[in-house]
């Protein structure tokens, strides 16, 4: 049996296919979903969602949101998402390095809003790099 997975952002549908299994970056850790999973609603962290439509796994960078599992359908509603295959690994690596430096700089100061923004940007850059297949 398979699961129908839809990844939806405010702008578009990023993924709408059947998969054998998927792994979600929930706020409590990685969450594996197979067919006939119990109904579930979970918050998602910024990270990499992995789907296996056939033999091979595919990565999707997700920028936080929610996932609902019910009746072999998974709806993933996120602030942003990109297929790993569409992300340029080199530019993702450069963005990650820049975000890492900005986070280190922000953490030296006392400006909490700036620290939170830098941390969020770092998580997004890390998710994009990992989805593109780059090591962090």
From Swiss-Prot:
Regions of compositional bias (Basic and acidic residues) in chain numbering:
105-114
- What keywords appear on the UniProt entry? ATP synthesis, CF(1), Hydrogen ion transport, Ion transport, Membrane, Thylakoid, Transport
Q: Can you say what this protein is called?
A: ATP synthase epsilon chain
Topology in the lipid bilayer is annotated as:
Peripheral membrane protein
InterPro entries found in the cross-reference section: ATP_synth_F1_dsu/esu (IPR001469), ATP_synth_F1_dsu/esu_N (IPR020546), ATP_synth_F1_esu_C (IPR020547), ATPsynth_dsu/esu_N (IPR036771)
Cell compartments where the protein resides: Cellular thylakoid membrane
Query: Entry's Pfam families?
Result: ATP-synt_DE, ATP-synt_DE_N
Q: Which family does it belong to?
A: Belongs to the ATPase epsilon chain family.
Q: Organism's domain of life?
A: Bacteria
UniProt entry tagged with the keyword tRNA-binding:
no
SUPFAM superfamilies (UniProt xref): Epsilon subunit of F1F0-ATP synthase N-terminal domain
Give a short account of what the protein does. Produces ATP from ADP in the presence of a proton gradient across the membrane.
Choose any GO biological process term that the UniProt entry carries and state it: proton motive force-driven ATP synthesis
Subunit structure and binding partners: F-type ATPases have 2 components, CF(1) - the catalytic core - and CF(0) - the membrane proton channel. CF(1) has five subunits: alpha(3), beta(3), gamma(1), delta(1), epsilon(1). CF(0) has three main subunits: a, b and c.
Q: Where is this region: Disordered?
A: 100-120
A GO-annotated cellular component: plasma membrane-derived thylakoid membrane
